[in-house]
């Protein structure tokens, strides 16, 4: 007989996500999922896009479930008003078969073509590449980013246009998708760094699955030796500005710096933050509300 799960869905103020997620993990003994929270972007500003978020947790449907649901409802009613929701809706419960829970989300992912050559493909999807296609396989169930968000697409398109015959540094590598693309586009050496060791572990698994070699480390940016033909950073706008000097220092003479993860409304803030670096703003590309800045260093 198939095992079943109780999927508990809560509609809460976005600012309450961390508080509720911690409570749900403790209450259920399992992880949680958050709907409509982009995994490929790193801007805290996006929290304002949807003031209400959907958080889902998964419980074993045992004799204690009703008691746990009552405790959850009390927790939401007690804390939500402090986050601006005076009358939060009670959580809802749906029964799922284990197979549905484990694989149902896969229907939302399909092979995605980016630029002229790059294709991001879920591991389970059949795909017949065209001549010249550079295919990157990802399992979004384990990855920190799937490559489908505009910030990542803008980075990948800029990287493809530049070509990567030299060395590439990927700052905030996440799932490693940009690092893998750089290798497949012909980079001689690729270094990916991330402050999160879990992200680095995932990136290493993804690189191994795709048969590519990249140096993936948790080394702070300032401590990474050498300079690079291309430096990529798809991170918080505030962090881009804070790290402007260190990012610039890693760009080789004549090299390029690609900055993404920037909301269009924050574009001028980032540009102003790089005025003193001596880099030249060579190109600005946008997709929807997102912006990507391409800088070049002097010779």
Swiss-Prot record:
Q: Which UniProt keywords apply?
A: Cytoplasm, Methyltransferase, S-adenosyl-L-methionine, Transferase
A Pfam family in this protein? PrmA
Say yes or no: keyword tRNA-binding present. no
Primary location: cytoplasm
The signal peptide stretch is none
- Which top-level enzyme class is recorded in the Swiss-Prot or TrEMBL entry? transferase
Q: Which SUPFAM superfamilies match?
A: S-adenosyl-L-methionine-dependent methyltransferases
Compartment(s) = Cytoplasm
Residue positions annotated to bind S-adenosyl-L-methionine are 152, 172, 194, 234
This entry's Gene Ontology molecular function terms read:
protein-lysine N-methyltransferase activity
Q: Spell out the reaction equation it catalyses.
A: L-lysyl-[protein] + 3 S-adenosyl-L-methionine = N(6),N(6),N(6)-trimethyl-L-lysyl-[protein] + 3 S-adenosyl-L-homocysteine + 3 H(+)
Q: What EC number(s) does its UniProt record assign?
A: 2.1.1.-
Q: Output one GO BP term.
A: methylation
- Kindly indicate whether the keyword Cytoplasm belongs to this entry: yes
Q: What is its biological role?
A: Methylates ribosomal protein L11.
State the family named in the UniProt similarity comment for this chain.
Answer: Belongs to the methyltransferase superfamily. PrmA family.
- What is the designated name of this protein? Ribosomal protein L11 methyltransferase
């Amino acid at each position: 007989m198939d095992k079943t799960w109780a999927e508990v869905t809560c509609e809460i103020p976005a600012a309450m996500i961390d508080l509720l997620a911690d409570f749900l993990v403790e209450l259920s003994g399992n992880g949680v999922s958050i709907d409509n929270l982009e995994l490929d972007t790193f801007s805290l500003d996006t929290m304002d896009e949807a003031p209400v978020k959907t958080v889902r947790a998964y419980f074993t449907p045992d004799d204690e479930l009703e008691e746990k649901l009552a405790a959850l409802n009390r927790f939401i009613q007690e804390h939500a008003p402090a986050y601006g929701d005076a009358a939060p809706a009670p959580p809802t419960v749906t029964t799922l078969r284990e197979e549905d829970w484990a694989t149902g989300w896969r229907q939302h992912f399909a092979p995605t073509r980016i630029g002229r050559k790059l294709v991001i493909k879920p591991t389970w999807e059949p795909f017949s590449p065209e001549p010249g296609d550079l295919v990157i396989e990802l399992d979004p169930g384990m990855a920190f980013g799937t490559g489908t968000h505009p910030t990542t697409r803008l980075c990948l398109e800029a990287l493809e246009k530049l070509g990567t015959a030299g060395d590439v540094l990927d700052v905030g590598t996440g799932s490693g998708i940009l690092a893998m693309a750089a290798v497949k586009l012909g980079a001689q050496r690729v270094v990916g760094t991330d402050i999160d060791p879990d992200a680095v572990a995932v990136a290493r698994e993804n690189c191994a699955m795709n048969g590519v070699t990249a140096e993936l480390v948790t080394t702070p940016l300032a401590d990474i030796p050498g300079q690079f033909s291309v430096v990529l950073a798809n991170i918080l706008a505030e962090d881009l500005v804070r790290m402007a000097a260190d990012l610039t220092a890693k760009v080789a003479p004549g090299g390029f710096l690609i900055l993404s993860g920037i909301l269009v409304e924050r574009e001028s803030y980032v540009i102003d933050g790089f005025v003193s670096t001596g880099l030249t703003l060579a190109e600005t590309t946008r997709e929807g509300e997102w912006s990507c800045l391409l800088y070049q260093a002097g010779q």
